[in-house]
């Protein structure tokens, strides 16, 4: 059975672990526990063939900047996550996360993933953002950044409601299985 390695990166507390737990167990975790490194595996059928989707969760906190890239070799696709209600996590996609993964894995495809879309219209969240003269990140802003950074696609989801959740992983699988351009190897390699 072929394995697809999918590594999830992004700032701390944007919902990476919730995304993975909600997708793999259909349950939303009740408490926040910062991740150091975790992985999950699910079997998916694609065109009648079984694949193992290996999901690697990483720590977004700066303390783990040197440890995190150890999970990058052999990655088939990255999910670069930000919270649609955290403009700083959106900024860090461009400032930190895409530069980091492209430094280590130049040719590996990645999706830009907007998380926590259930909070986009929540009154208390909007008020908190307004105090700092901020607004939630829009679908259009996500799509624009994805194009600018050459992501395969921009997708959004809520791990809480599961809206768009399956689509995130379907798109990740498609990105990993896309036939590579003949001259390029697309798996992440460390030299």
Curated annotation (Swiss-Prot):
Q: Which UniProt keywords apply?
A: Cell junction, Cell membrane, Developmental protein, GTP-binding, Lipoprotein, Membrane, Methylation, Nucleotide-binding, Prenylation
PTM Cysteine methyl ester: at which residues? 188
Example of a GO MF term: GTPase activity
So where does GTP get bound? Answer: 10-17, 57-61, 115-118
Gene3D superfamilies registered for this protein in UniProt = P-loop containing nucleotide triphosphate hydrolases
Q: How does it sit in the membrane?
A: Lipid-anchor
Lipidation feature positions (S-geranylgeranyl cysteine): 188
Localization, UniProt: Cell junction, Adherens junction; Cell membrane
Alphabetical list of InterPro entries matching this protein: Cdc42 (IPR037874), P-loop_NTPase (IPR027417), Small_GTP-bd (IPR005225), Small_GTPase (IPR001806), Small_GTPase_Rho (IPR003578)
- Give the SMART domains listed for this entry: RAB, RAS, RHO
Chain residues in the propeptide: 189-191
Query: Which Gene Ontology BP terms does the record give?
Result: ameboidal-type cell migration; anatomical structure morphogenesis; cellular process involved in reproduction in multicellular organism; developmental process involved in reproduction; hemocyte migration; maintenance of protein location; melanization defense response; positive regulation of cellular component organization
Q: Does the keyword Disulfide bond apply?
A: no
Per the annotation, the residue ranges of the short sequence motif Effector region are 32-40
Task: Give the family this protein belongs to, as stated in its UniProt record.
Answer: Belongs to the small GTPase superfamily. Rho family. CDC42 subfamily.
Q: State the protein's purpose.
A: Regulates mbt kinase activity and is also required to recruit mbt to adherens junctions. Together with mbt, regulates photoreceptor cell morphogenesis.
What is the protein's name according to its record?
Cdc42 homolog
Q: From the UniProt record, report the name of the gene that encodes this protein.
A: Cdc42
